[in-house]
């Protein structure tokens, strides 16, 4: 393992829950570091009880966070970022601001989360566009070829997950976006499983929307997420919702992502996400990310030791992520999941689409926890 400040002592101090069980479900929701949670709790107490609390301090923290997140995903402008409650909300904002006409088509993948798929299916059922699907493969070249077969001049929207929530496969986002741009399609990327897990560079992708979470791999407070909106798209799209906050001081609609922020919001939660981001800067982002990479590789190597385990995630890090999915021959996912949680206190995520278990190896997990998982599977 990398010589990182994130060691056993730090994990014990910052993540006390890890002493009571193993949390391999960061892809569902992350565990917030204790010191960052305390910063949030103190801020909530002060904000909600002190009449003379300085709102400028809170607003300043929110804008600092906006700058940090823009930098984290390599956005060109700070104003390309708007805050949402979750990636699902970001997806809805993106899709809802596209006007579909008869004959339009939407292209997505065969491994999408309901956050995106349910919305796209609804559009198709209303007769507004036809839904087409490309197949995700372990090999990016094969995935790309499938995309090319589905995309055409009729494609109004190309929407896909950067990392599959089912298999943990990392899609070739840049190349897929190039295919979409050639036919003039809007491009939306579901980044629910990426930010805090793998590097993200939206300028490289040139997508119109990139929806991300703050509460999964970033391990921030629940209800903190954000949406990247390409500045060119923000100008041309007609917002579905406009209200107080969507306009600048002269009442003109904002010409950037911030037009999608309106009404009273729980800004105080963003104070907590900023505390987490600051903590990662202190620990070193690269070492944190390197730890996820090394733990994921170690997990897959150990799983391959068990003949009855079928790993659905590529070994190559450039083709995968911190999510690893596997099936156990002869056992249903309900049997395996229940066995791990009830008898070993190992929490995972079920993937019913492929009868698999998904393991999310975050930076606070350890080799010992992986060894214990392997021990449990061998005893099954």
Protein language model features and the residues they cover:
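Pyridoxal 5′-phosphate
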Residues: 1-380
């Amino acid at each position: 393992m990398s010589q990182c400040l994130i060691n056993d002592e730090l994990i014990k101090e910052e993540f006390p829950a890890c002493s009571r069980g193993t949390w391999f479900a960061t892809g569902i929701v992350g565990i917030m570091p204790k010191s960052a949670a305390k910063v949030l709790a103190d801020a909530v107490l002060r904000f909600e009880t002190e009449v003379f609390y300085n709102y400028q301090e809170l607003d300043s923290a929110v804008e600092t966070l906006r700058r940090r997140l823009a930098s984290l995903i390599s956005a060109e402008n700070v104003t390309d970022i708007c805050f949402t409650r979750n990636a699902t909300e970001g997806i809805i904002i993106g899709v809802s601001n596209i006007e579909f006409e008869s004959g339009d088509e939407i292209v997505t993948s065969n491994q999408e989360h309901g956050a995106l798929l349910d919305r796209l299916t609804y559009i198709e059922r209303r007769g507004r566009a036809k839904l087409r699907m490309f197949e995700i493969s372990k090999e990016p070249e094969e995935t790309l070829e499938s995309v090319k077969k589905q995309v055409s001049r009729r494609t109004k929207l190309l929407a896909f997950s950067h990392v599959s929530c089912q298999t943990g496969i990392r899609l070739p986002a840049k190349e897929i976006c190039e295919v979409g741009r050639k036919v003039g399609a809007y491009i939306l990327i579901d980044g629910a499983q990426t930010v805090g897990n793998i590097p993200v560079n939206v300028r490289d992708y040139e997508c119109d929307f990139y929806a991300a979470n703050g509460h999964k791999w970033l391990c921030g407070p629940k209800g903190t997420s954000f949406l990247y909106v390409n500045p060119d798209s923000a100008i041309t799209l007609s917002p579905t919702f406009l209200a107080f906050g969507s306009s600048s001081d002269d009442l003109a609609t904002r010409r950037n992502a911030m037009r999608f922020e309106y009404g009273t919001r729980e800004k105080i939660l963003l104070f907590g996400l900023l505390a987490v981001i600051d903590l990662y800067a202190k620990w070193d982002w690269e070492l944190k990310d390197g730890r996820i990479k090394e733990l994921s590789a170690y997990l897959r190597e150990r799983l391959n030791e068990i003949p009855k385990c079928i790993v659905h995630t590529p070994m190559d890090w450039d083709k995968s992520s911190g999510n690893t999915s596997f099936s156990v021959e002869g056992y249903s996912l309900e049997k395996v999941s229940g066995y791990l949680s009830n008898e070993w206190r190992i929490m995972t995520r079920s993937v019913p689409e492929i009868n698999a278990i998904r393991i999310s190896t975050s930076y606070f997990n350890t080799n010992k926890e992986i060894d214990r998982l392997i021990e449990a599977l061998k005893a099954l």
